[in-house]
């Protein structure tokens, strides 16, 4: 026991000394002024997080030709494209970005068309598609009141395809159901109320627990009048989510705002949430895929694609992919036609967030359009800062996030792709995806295809900005894809397609 007391005493004295306090013989605590000799030697240093300080793979010997694909040059395209989104915001649109069917979407198409013509591509054209009726939110708000206090929840964002609120809005009692599992709903009356769900990002807006554990539909089926979902991401990010909670007004909300609401619910009785959501259904909108071609020396082709519509600034999704596609168009435009075995078709595909009409058209016409396609490459979500949640912070690193990857084709094609990723330092997941996601998903099995894609914390959020798209990642992916095209052009198409099922 004496030893324990002695140890505690030492710890206590150490703690008081660290606090700049000592205990005198009279028992009173006295503040001791620190001198230069007693001050902590620790200085809070910072590591610059700009494009010059991200980890970067040195250009391997023998791969010097790909050095023309420079990250800083590619990133200028990201800035040019996201500027269109910023104009959409600055013009006063609440639902802003390069939204399919809007003039900002068409402005982006013009950037691509002008670039294709500048690079000398041939058969530059727009392929127009009529969009299905689009439900576009035009005005919304949410406040919570209780205990004499009212808070405005500024990060609420209507879910895509959400139902509108009744004229005059709704005033509802909020009910917290945690993750929204069957156990969370057990014994809770949510009928006619606002159901509040905390969702685990796995890793972000496109894939999260409220979707895959059925929480959203569970709320609707139990009679909820409205739905509010928050991704457990530190900070106060505003997300564009596909809540899919049935025919009720549905919203996402940032973590800090959710915390304010939860604390109000904990401290005050009879909390009420007022919400308003106006939605306009617009018909007659259209969108275009923008095409350009570099002729080869055979009747076969390679297709390199990237969709151009986006929510918010959409730097990762998908200005990053567009920049790589445009960089590859410029790179291969400088290769003489006699050295291009196959025609390379570049396309900025239309309406990804409105049904992926561009890639669906390719699939619908695969018997003719893809009959001689040796490879499709989808450039989507290709470079984003790797982050780590740490306490109440989302901490950035000086590394590019790993990507999910997909190959539909022969073992030889897979080896070509993975070797190129290793050569240029493109980090990928261990296992290949069981299915292609993104715009590639609609056409992925119609011809040999590859893609890398990642949809992390910043995806579909107002923090998907220029600064979270490292030039180093753009550069690595562009160089890898260029090398893959060169390698594939040395392989016959029959050796790129998947082996027949059941063959060895």
Describe the residue ranges of each PLM region.
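Noncatalytic luminal/extracellular "stalk/propeptide" segments of secretory-pathway proteins
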Residues: 76-79, 88-194, 201
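Second-shell loop/turn segments in exported
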Residues: 60-70, 91-106, 172-176, 200-210, ...
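Soluble metallo-hydrolase cores and metallopeptidase-like ectodomains found primarily
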Residues: 152-187, 242-316, 327-330, 334-335, ...
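His/Asp/Glu-rich mid-to-C-terminal helical/loop segments that flank catalytic regions of hydrolases
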Residues: 457-504
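Metal-dependent peptidase/peptidase-like ectodomains
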Residues: 258, 297-299, 349-451
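Sec/Tat-exported extracytoplasmic proteins
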Residues: 69, 73, 78, 82-89, ...
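N-terminal hydrophobic or amphipathic helices/low-complexity stretches enriched
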Residues: 32-105, 110, 114, 119, ...
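Structural recognition of the beta-strand scaffold that forms the well-ordered cores
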Residues: 77-82, 125-126, 176, 194-198, ...
């Amino acid at each position: 026991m004496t030893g324990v007391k002695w140890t505690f005493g030492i710890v206590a004295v150490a703690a008081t000394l660290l606090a700049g306090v000592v205990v005198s013989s009279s028992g009173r605590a006295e503040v001791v002024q620190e001198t230069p000799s007693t001050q902590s030697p620790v200085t809070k240093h910072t590591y610059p997080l700009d494009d010059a300080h991200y980890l970067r793979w040195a250009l391997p010997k023998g791969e010097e030709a790909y050095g023309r694909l420079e990250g800083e040059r590619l990133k200028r395209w990201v800035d040019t494209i996201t500027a269109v989104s910023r104009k959409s915001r600055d013009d006063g649109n609440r639902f802003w970005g390069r939204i399919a069917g809007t003039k900002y979407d068409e402005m982006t198409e013009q950037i691509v068309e002008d670039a294709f013509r500048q690079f000398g591509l041939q058969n530059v054209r727009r392929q127009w598609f009529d969009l299905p009726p689009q439900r576009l939110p035009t005005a919304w708000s949410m406040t919570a009141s209780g205990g004499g206090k009212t808070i405005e929840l500024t990060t609420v964002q209507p879910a895509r395809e959400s139902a509108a609120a009744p004229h005059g809005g709704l005033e509802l009692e909020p009910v917290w159901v945690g993750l929204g599992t069957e156990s969370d709903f057990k014994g809770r009356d949510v009928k006619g109320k606002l159901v509040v769900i905390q969702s685990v990002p796995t890793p972000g807006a496109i894939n999260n627990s409220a979707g895959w554990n059925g929480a959203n539909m569970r709320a609707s089926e139990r009679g909820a009048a409205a739905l509010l979902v928050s991704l457990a991401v530190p900070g106060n990010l505003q997300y564009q989510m596909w809540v899919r909670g049935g025919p009720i007004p549905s919203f996402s909300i940032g973590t800090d705002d959710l915390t304010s609401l939860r604390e109000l619910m904990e401290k005050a009785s009879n909390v009420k949430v007022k919400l308003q959501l106006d939605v306009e259904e617009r018909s007659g909108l259209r969108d275009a895929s923008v095409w350009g071609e570099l002729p080869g020396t055979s009747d076969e082709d390679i297709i390199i694609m990237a969709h151009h519509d986006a929510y918010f600034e959409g730097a990762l999704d998908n200005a990053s992919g567009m920049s790589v596609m445009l960089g590859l168009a410029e790179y291969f435009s400088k290769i003489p036609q006699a050295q291009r075995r196959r025609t390379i078709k570049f396309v900025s595909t239309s309406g990804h967030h409105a049904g992926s009409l561009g890639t669906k058209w390719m699939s619908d016409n695969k018997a003719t359009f893809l009959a001689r396609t040796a490879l499709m490459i989808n450039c989507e979500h290709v470079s984003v800062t790797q982050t780590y949640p740490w306490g109440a912070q989302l901490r950035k690193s000086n590394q590019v996030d790993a990507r999910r990857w997909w190959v539909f084709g022969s073992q030889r094609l897979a080896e070509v792709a993975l070797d190129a990723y290793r050569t240029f330092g493109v980090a990928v997941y261990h296992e290949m995806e069981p299915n292609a996601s993104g715009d590639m998903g609609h056409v992925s099995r119609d011809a040999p295809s590859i893609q890398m894609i990642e949809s992390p914390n910043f995806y579909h959020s107002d923090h998907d900005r220029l600064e979270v798209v490292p030039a180093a990642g753009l550069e690595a992916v562009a160089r890898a894809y260029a090398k893959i095209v060169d390698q594939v052009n040395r392989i016959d198409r029959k050796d790129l397609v998947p082996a027949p099922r059941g063959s060895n």
